[in-house]
Regions:
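Beta-strand-rich assembly/attachment modules of structural machines
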Residues: 1-165
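C-terminal extracytoplasmic interaction modules
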Residues: 2, 40-42, 49-51, 57-67, ...
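Short aromatic-centered micro-motifs
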Residues: 22-24, 37, 197, 301, ...
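Short, isolated positions in well-ordered beta-strands
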Residues: 30-32, 44-46, 204, 307-310, ...
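Local beta-strand/beta-hairpin segments that build beta-sheet-rich folds
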Residues: 32, 114-117, 308, 496-503
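Short, conserved beta-turn/loop elements at beta-strand boundaries and strand-helix junctions
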Residues: 122-132, 306, 652-661
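Short solvent-exposed strand/turn elements
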Residues: 128-153, 380, 659-680
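Long, low-complexity intrinsically disordered regions enriched in Ser/Thr/Asp/Glu with frequent Gly/Pro
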Residues: 244-247, 279-415
Length: 752
């Protein structure tokens, strides 16, 4: 049997067909096509009247470069599909669309197949006397997935496994591991190696998600899986130094309820929610929810912008306060030893699968009358890491955007069976490669090419998150011919496409790489661009208007070179401003940028694509476009516009009926945009610690009449010390203004 990529290049081919396979919720399979054929032991009914494959677009709102939606209209004069809707229901069925070449005369397939679409079926769009219309959304339509997924609430947020299949999955997560819906609870009293208790020798089949129900099922004090936050310490009579007896102030932070448990990737400063605080007369005790776990570690804690040291056993720390990491967020929670009842038994919540702190500060920092401001610098989630062969390596802390994207996908419901892990490992290796740059003092250092430090405290759709992380690291998603999701790096042609692929018609390399297809106007004896009815080539060259072409970009980030202080970078194209007389400013939708160097490289690359890459081409071709995806590099020879093997990057593909015709839109490409030095600026142009700061200690609890407010700052050696408030507020401000860099003959300026 021939390959579809060999057949598509022939002057005369067999009939190209799309095959629709739909599996309903009860396991029943339906097979349709535009023609009645037999393939793979199944008969495809000629039910499809028309179908619409929505165009595939790079950097789409769905966050992934795949067909977002399919609409199919089928013959329904006999009410066949209507009966299935009444008896079974179409909603939630899975739809797979594959492509092949088929010989209708011999009733045999003449090629292998390629998966074009995989998705979930909606409820029927409409049903008429003769037609039945269904639509399906792609599995990668991330607009329907919201992160963070867990809300702060008094009842436990973990799903309870109510039947034997769910309890089997709850033991260790089954095939989904830690991403199983039933893994956080894990009740599996009737399973080998399971957790929990039974009633009368029979496992519980339901749960009210309360503390009482959790205790009855043996999951509260045993494995400590309860995830609700309901404990509020009682007010007791206390006596502070030099004061009389009074009731201790207790602040139950009810404002956090219905907020979201933070998700922290990489390393970042953030404001974690305070669960409660209680003052004992001299000290204020707090529990602080760090986020979903397991996380790596806590580096630093500030309360009202004063640094609090890590608690040390055997030392009197009442003058400074202290913090302890009670739990890093393991599946089995940990009780706070500071919260016990009169008998010494734990009285608080175990925070199953959540990380949290116990923070104690003296009255001079906070007297318990109001909630303080708590800031934490922490190393975030430990995520699974895989080898180049796709094998699991370990679960560890990482700031690599490839593994962070995989974790987001897994939390969004994707299984490992639908992911090409080897492609993620290859992208991860590229991101981890060391490149040379300068620190804020101008010293030469080596850093990973791309990293991601991101804290999610407010819910947003996963499509925005994926697109933001991709924009900050030049990553893109595509599908393989077998239907697996792949992660690739947008790069120069030599690095992105070093070898020839099966669907390419290229016969020679271009700048060290292979174009995935070469489209020509016939000037070199080859013509594979369709012509219109009047004989004109179906080629349209366009450009964006001035107002749609930004020449000034800005991005915010926490700079790892400057102790993760909040910062921003503004980059301009001076030549374009001189040319147009206008400053067109926009904020780059990039998330997780970790340092000044990566911010400069990404802004430089984005500016180049917007201004120098402001040439787009749209052309129509035949089934020869099969195999091409957004992000691929092709060449176009169209002498009328002066294009001769000019590389373009595909940004949009719109397939027609049965893939017989395809419209392709591409953006002009230059390899120089992707060099590691593009956009880099001298390190000593960035923010530096302010001079004159020094290491100090907080005021003691008693005996000091100096009433100045002190705030955490950064010393010249990068250590946190103390400085006066007015001085510290300037540590994160950029001091460069109007510095100009010349790259590729164009003047570029940067300010911060």
């Amino acid at each position: 049997m021939s390959s579809i990529y060999d057949l598509k290049e022939q002057a005369v081919t067999d009939t190209p067909l799309l095959l629709f396979n739909c599996v309903l919720q009860n396991g029943q399979s339906e097979y349709w096509s535009t023609h009645q054929i037999s393939y793979g032991g199944n008969t495809y009914a000629p039910r499809v009247i028309k179908h619409n494959l929505i165009e595939v677009q790079a950097a789409s709102d769905q966050g992934v470069d795949v067909i977002p939606r399919v609409s199919v209209s089928m013959a329904n004069a006999d009410s066949y599909f209507s009966e299935l809707e009444r008896s079974v229901g179409w909603k939630g069925a899975t739809l797979t669309v594959t492509f092949l070449f088929y010989d209708l005369l011999t009733s045999a397939a003449t090629s292998d197949t390629a998966v074009i679409f995989q998705g979930i079926v909606n409820s029927p769009d409409q049903s008429t006397e003769s037609l039945f219309q269904l639509s399906a959304i792609n599995l990668m339509n991330m607009q329907r997935v919201l992160l963070p997924p867990v809300r702060i609430q008094r009842r436990c947020p973990w799903l309870f496994p109510g039947n034997i299949q769910q309890r089997q999955d709850a033991v260790s997560g089954g095939n989904s591991g830690q991403y199983s819906l039933y893994y956080p609870c894990g009740y599996s009293a009737d399973q080998a190696g399971g957790a929990g208790t039974m009633v009368g020798g029979v496992p519980y089949t339901s749960c009210g998600y309360t503390r009482t129900d959790c205790e009855a099922r043996g999951m509260f004090t045993g494995p400590k899986r309860f995830g609700g936050l309901e404990f509020v310490p009682s007010s007791i009579q206390v006596r502070g130094y030099g004061t009389g007896w009074q009731y201790a102030p207790v602040d139950d932070n009810v404002a956090i309820y219905n907020d979201f448990v933070p998700l922290l990737y990489g390393t970042a400063w953030y404001y974690p929610p305070i669960v409660f605080s209680r003052n004992d007369g001299n000290l204020t005790h707090m529990e602080v929810l760090l986020g979903m776990g397991p996380i790596q570690d806590v580096r630093m804690v500030l309360v009202n912008q004063i640094q609090i040291p890590l608690g040390q056993s055997g030392k009197n720390m009442t003058s400074t306060g202290w913090y302890n990491v009670v739990s890093l967020g393991s599946r089995n929670g940990v009780f706070n030893p500071d919260c016990v009842d009169a008998s010494g038994n734990p009285a608080g919540d175990p925070y199953g699968s959540m990380a949290y702190l116990s923070v104690v500060v003296p009255n001079q920092i906070n007297n318990g009358q109001s909630l303080p401001t708590v800031q934490v610098l922490a190393d975030g989630l430990q995520v699974p890491i895989y080898g180049s062969d796709g094998s699991y390596q370990n679960t560890a802390f990482t700031a690599n955007p490839a593994w962070i994207l995989l974790d987001i996908l897994r939390r969004s419901g994707w299984s490992m069976a639908n992911v090409d892990i080897a492609s993620f490992a290859a992208a991860s290796a590229f991101c981890d490669q060391q490149i040379q740059t300068q620190d804020l003092s101008g010293n030469s250092i080596m850093i990973p090419r791309f990293q991601c430090n991101l804290c999610l405290q407010h819910r947003r759709n996963a499509g925005d998150l994926i697109r933001g992380i991709r924009n900050g690291s030049r990553l893109l998603f595509t599908y393989s011919t077998s239907g697996l999701l792949q992660l690739q790096v947008e790069n120069s042609i030599a690095l992105q496409q070093p070898s020839q692929v099966a669907w390419s018609n290229s016969t020679e390399t271009l700048n060290g790489g292979w174009p995935y297809y070469e489209f020509e106007d016939g000037s070199t004896s080859t013509a594979n661009i369709l012509r219109k009815a009047n004989g004109e080539p179906s080629v349209v060259v366009t450009s964006r208007s001035i107002v749609d072409t930004p020449n000034q970009l800005t991005v915010e980030f926490q700079d790892a070179f400057n102790s993760y202080q909040q910062d921003s970078l503004l980059m301009v194209d001076v030549d374009d401003i001189d040319l147009t007389g206008q400053v067109i400013t926009t904020s780059l939708m990039a998330l997780g940028i970790p340092n000044y160097d990566q911010a400069a490289r990404i802004l430089g690359y984005t500016l180049d694509r917007a201004i120098q890459g402001n040439t787009y081409i749209t052309l129509e071709t035949s089934v020869k476009a099969l195999g091409l995806r957004p992000g691929d590099l092709i060449t176009v020879t169209y002498l009328k516009e002066g294009f001769e093997r000019q590389p373009f990057r595909i940004v949009k593909i719109a397939p027609g009926s049965n893939y017989r015709t395809t419209k392709i839109t591409g953006q002009i490409h230059q390899d120089s945009w992707y060099e590691d030095t593009n956009g880099q600026m001298p390190g000593n142009t960035g923010a530096r610690p302010q001079p004159g700061s020094a290491v100090g200690v907080p005021h003691p609890l008693l005996g000091n009449t100096n009433r100045h407010e002190w705030r955490a700052a950064i010393s010249d050696h990068g250590e946190f010390g103390q400085c006066q408030r007015r001085r510290c507020n300037r540590t994160a401000q950029r001091g460069i203004l109007g510095s100009v860099q010349h790259t590729g003959g164009r003047a570029r300026g940067a300010t911060g």
